[in-house]
Swiss-Prot record:
One of its GO terms (cellular component) is ribosome. Belongs to the universal ribosomal protein uL4 family. It comes from Clostridium perfringens (strain ATCC 13124 / DSM 756 / JCM 1290 / NCIMB 6125 / NCTC 8237 / Type A). The keyword Membrane does not apply. Keywords: Ribonucleoprotein, Ribosomal protein, RNA-binding, rRNA-binding. This is Large ribosomal subunit protein uL4. One of its GO terms (molecular function) is rRNA binding. One of the primary rRNA binding proteins, this protein initially binds near the 5'-end of the 23S rRNA. It is important during the early stages of 50S assembly. It makes multiple contacts with different domains of the 23S rRNA in the assembled 50S subunit and ribosome. Forms part of the polypeptide exit tunnel. NCBIfam families: rplD_bact. Residues 44-76 are annotated as: Disordered. GO terms for biological process: translation. InterPro entries: Ribosomal_uL4 (IPR002136), Ribosomal_uL4-like (IPR013005), Ribosomal_uL4_dom_sf (IPR023574). The keyword Thylakoid does not apply. Part of the 50S ribosomal subunit.
């Protein structure tokens, strides 16, 4: 079973913690990771883009000038794509980009992402701030030399969230909001011991 250090928020190691091998010690499945990340990014897209084709633009029903004898190029409509205020060629239309991923693949991707972050994981014995204080959050991050950090708490913690939300490259979320993209996108994964237990309950 993987074993990592257990730290307090001052950066001092206070013990070790055994991680569940079914969650933090699996073989990393790159295919599942790719599929889930692509789906997650696709599902973020609004798909509300829209433009008018030449048939949808108002006007342009009459031929602007006769076909021959003017010396100018022949034209059939002032709403053709080459005209100013003309329609758009292959105009984008609203569409649904959503992708569905099987539950089993989502689980494989999540355990693969967690396993890939064990080497960059900092498990905290506890994480609380008496009041929202960015200085305290910066002090904690500096103690671990953390860069581009994802902080995972067991529950929604307003003081922790407000303390870290203004720090560039730091994301805070409760354990029930974790996702594959954010796990892979961080360089340091900072997680509380209670959050680790909750993850193991769900994915073991």
């Amino acid at each position: 079973m993987p074993k990592v250090g257990l730290f307090n928020k001052e950066g001092q190691q206070v013990g070790d913690i055994q991680l569940n091998e079914q969650v933090f010690g699996v073989e990393v499945n790159k295919y599942a990771l790719h599929q889930v990340v692509v789906a997650q990014l696709a599902n973020k897209r609004q798909g509300t883009q829209s433009a008018k084709t030449r048939s949808e633009v108002r006007g342009g029903g009459i031929k602007p000038w006769r076909q021959k004898g003017t010396g100018r190029a022949r034209q059939g409509s002032i709403r053709a794509p080459q005209w100013i205020k003309g329609g758009v060629v292959f105009a984008p239309k609203p569409r649904d980009y959503r992708m569905s991923i099987p539950k089993s693949m989502r689980k494989v991707a999540m355990t693969s992402a967690l396993t890939s972050k064990v080497a960059d994981m900092v498990v905290l014995e506890d994480l609380t701030f008496e009041a929202p204080k960015t200085k305290e959050a910066v002090k904690m991050l500096n103690a671990f030399e953390a860069k581009k950090t994802l902080i995972i708490t067991a529950e929604v913690n307003e003081n922790v969230y407000k303390s870290a939300r203004n720090i560039e490259g730091v994301t805070v979320m409760p354990v029930n909001n974790i996702n594959v993209y954010d796990l892979l996108n961080c360089k340091t994964l900072m997680i509380t011991k209670e959050a680790v237990n909750k993850i193991e309950e769900v994915y073991a």
